Amino acid sequence: MAIMDAKTTFSNQQSVVVSSGGSVVCGSTVWSGAIASGGGQVVDQGKAGDAVGQELTLKVAAGATAIVGGGAAAALQVVLQTADSNVDSAFKDLVLSPAVTVGSAGFKGSLFECRVPAGAKRYLRVVYKNSGAAITSGTINAYLTRDL
């Protein structure tokens, strides 16, 4: 099991209900205390740089409520974004996961895991993109850890 730190948590039981073709951003505020259940935030690494020997792994999984789509084609893609400043327009895609079909029966379990690649800047955030039928219910957890 991974060690979770509030400062490196993007989403804590955050809703991913989104219309077809829509997106949910993990949040726009930087950690200032414990992240509330249902909330999301931007992670501030303190400075840019490639942490050789201290690599971080992004882990994203369905939360307590299964992710359910409005049809069999409902799919969710995880996008890790990075920026020098915490301004929406500054964030650029760093890693894109394959789209995971969540379907109408519901999805529980891991959606995506990857090492944060070289080139990450000071601020990181996660965006959940829907590439199929609407997502009608579900929560998600996403965080950084040193575990793989």
What do the PLM-derived regions correspond to, one by one?
Residues 1-148:
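Surface-exposed, low-hydrophobicity beta-strand/loop segments enriched in small/polar/acidic residues
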